[in-house]
Amino acid sequence: MRIRVPSKKIRERFLLIYELKGCQKAVDFLTRYYGVRRMRIVLNGRKVGNGDIACYEDNKAYFTKRGLNKSNVLHELYHHLAYVDGWEMSERREEMEADRYARKVLRKTIGNS
């Protein structure tokens, strides 16, 4: 399953909110855009584990200090959207799709496409 990449205007607004107001407000903006419940951002490296820098569980995305960046936030947002919509897919496929989603959102915004 693929989640549609927002329009350039929405992507630019996300980046602006992220830079000026922080990642939680930016994620709130995108969850409103997609019409799903809010995903909470938690900066707590102890909850992450397994050498990962971020993880998603039950409407919360946990990040280490090192892992809190736009790309990882968008990656975990994909997991949230898949969870809320009840999509069933293999862990590997979901990880690949989450990476692809984050890359497309950032590349299309920063690359002026």
For each predicted feature, which ranges?
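Auxiliary, metal-adjacent structural segments of Zn-dependent hydrolase domains
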Residues: 2-66
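Short pre-active-site segment immediately N-terminal to the catalytic Zn-binding motif
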Residues: 56-73, 86-89, 93
